[in-house]
Regions:
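Gly/Ser/Thr/Pro-rich low-complexity, intrinsically disordered segments
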Residues: 1-155
Length: 155
């Protein structure tokens, strides 16, 4: 299963999880979802099998999709856009330089990326203005999981 892994040294990775249920002391968190959409820079050959990539509103093929990947330097890459298939999302991340990538949320109700406390910001802001959920989404109880990315101090 595709897994976003955060390690105690501050690094992150996206990889196929093949380890035991207990990941060990080096792992700070792990977020799993479906198979990898990119591995070794190559598209998953099953990207055209719509049933593998989540249920869409109204059985639409092209919907809001988000994904995350890592490049050769270990940098984290995020992509989100409307009107995407699993394959087109994988292509976006591949062209951005991802070697490994996974799909995150799909459908307009769930794809969310908000900035909190950005330098000079007076309030939270959305990555893309067409993302439907409010910027306060994760500042109050929510029925979906989420994770946060913080900048390293002094870096």
């Amino acid at each position: 299963m595709a897994t976003l892994v955060g390690l105690r040294d501050g690094s992150v990775d996206v990889r196929e999880w093949t380890g035991p249920p207990r990941p060990g002391p080096a792992v700070l968190f792990a977020r799993q979802n479906l198979p990898l959409i990119l591995e070794n820079g190559q598209l998953n050959p099953n990207l055209s099998d719509g049933s593998l990539w989540g249920a869409t509103l109204g059985n639409a093929i092209r919907v809001w999709r988000s994904g995350i990947g890592v490049d050769a330097r270990g940098d984290l890459l995020y992509a989100a856009a409307d009107n995407q298939t699993a394959e087109s999302l994988a292509l976006i991340l591949q062209r951005a330089g991802a070697l490994r990538a996974m799909e995150l949320d799909i459908n307009s109700e769930w794809v969310t990326f908000n900035f909190y406390g950005a330098p000079g910001a007076s309030e939270p802001s959305k990555l893309l203005p067409d993302m439907t959920r409010e910027t306060t989404r994760y500042l109050e109880p929510d029925d979906r999981d989420f994770f946060a990315v913080f900048s390293r101090s002094g870096g």
